[in-house]
UniProtKB/Swiss-Prot annotation:
GO terms for molecular function: methenyltetrahydrofolate cyclohydrolase activity; methylenetetrahydrofolate dehydrogenase (NADP+) activity. Homodimer. It comes from Herpetosiphon aurantiacus (strain ATCC 23779 / DSM 785 / 114-95). CDD domains: NAD_bind_m-THF_DH_Cyclohyd (cd01080). It catalyses: (6R)-5,10-methylene-5,6,7,8-tetrahydrofolate + NADP(+) = (6R)-5,10-methenyltetrahydrofolate + NADPH; (6R)-5,10-methenyltetrahydrofolate + H2O = (6R)-10-formyltetrahydrofolate + H(+). NADP(+) binds at residues 166-168, 191, 232. Keywords: Amino-acid biosynthesis, Histidine biosynthesis, Hydrolase, Methionine biosynthesis, Multifunctional enzyme, NADP, One-carbon metabolism, Oxidoreductase, Purine biosynthesis. It holds the Pfam family THF_DHG_CYH_C. The keyword NADP applies. The gene is folD. GO terms for cellular component: cytosol. Pathway: One-carbon metabolism; tetrahydrofolate interconversion. One of its GO terms (biological process) is methionine biosynthetic process. This is Bifunctional protein FolD.
Length: 286
């Protein structure tokens, strides 16, 4: 069996064109473009690279971008004050708190300080709760990107058994909610799951998001399964692989996302889509 390649780069290009047009229409109506701000405490090479990629994405669709950098020694009160200032600024529509934070800072406290209407990472408890209840919410970008790929390739989820490997608030949990909303039967696996391979083999849809290179192999998959690989693992200088062993899994799956080039390129487009959604919502309330 030769698996269908779920091409994230192609979808990202399509989404970029759509968002760019919608952003231009928004600016024509309101007189301003959606504005995104990233709040970063200190930083490292990986964090700085990601911030630059967000800047390029914003510039590519005509959105405004700003970076607010705080010293590495910042305390919780300083961080939350910066977040609250951006939350209260009517010229800012989307806010990202760049993770990870230094050890003296609470990520939960920082996220809670956000205006949930500007929480374009979809991590605020209000957005998580609204998603769980099936209400309109800003959804975390990575799982939203995975769902967009399934939609792009018209993969039906109703009545299918979806196995999600990973239970983070960023990917695993929200992805399970999104799949459930599309009438899939969902199983979430994690580090304490007994007989992991047996559970994965039950999945018509398998999503891996644990940060362990090659954890899911072809032997674990039901023949014909659809595989979403959210893993990004650097195993050698310049070599990135996913949580799924591509060589074996691509021979068993009916469709699979590559790494790189699968879910990753769509993630930034979902961030832009959330920023546009937030700007539109705030404009309606003004």
């Amino acid at each position: 069996m030769t698996a269908l390649l779920l091409d994230g780069r192609g979808l990202a290009k399509e989404l970029k064109a759509q968002i760019s047009q919608q952003g231009a229409e928004f600016k024509a109506r309101t007189g301003y473009a959606p504005q995104l701000v990233v709040i970063q405490v200190a930083g490292n090479a990986a964090s700085d690279w990601y911030v630059r990629s967000i800047r390029r994405s914003c510039e590519g669709v005509g959105f405004g971008f700003a970076l607010q950098r705080l010293p590495e020694t910042s305390d919780q009160a300083t961080l939350e004050a910066a977040i609250q200032q951006a939350s209260n600024d009517p010229a800012i529509h989307g806010i990202i708190i760049q993770m990870p934070l230094p050890s003296q800072l609470s990520a939960d406290g920082a996220v809670a300080a956000l205006n949930p209407q500007k929480d374009v990472d979809g991590l605020h408890p209000t957005n998580a709760g609204r998603l769980a209840q099936g209400l309109t919410a800003l959804v975390p970008n990575t799982p939203a990107g995975g769902m967009a790929l399934l939609d792009r390739y018209q993969i039906n989820l109703a009545g299918k058994h979806a196995v999600v490997v990973g239970r983070s608030n960023v990917v695993g949990k929200p992805l399970a909610q999104l799949l459930l909303a599309r009438h899939a039967t969902v199983t979430i696996c994690h580090s304490r799951t007994a007989n992991l391979a047996e559970v994965i083999r039950q999945g018509d849809i398998v999503a891996a998001a644990v940060g362990k290179a090659g954890l899911v192999t072809g032997e674990m998959l039901k023949p014909g399964a659809v595989v979403l690989d959210f893993g990004i693992n650097e195993v050698a200088e310049g070599q990135v692989v996913g949580d799924v062993d591509w060589e074996s899994a691509s021979k068993v799956a009916s469709a699979i996302t590559p790494v790189p080039g699968g879910t990753g390129p769509v993630t930034n487009m979902m961030l832009l889509q959330n920023t546009l959604q937030a700007a539109q919502s705030l404009a309606e309330q003004a």
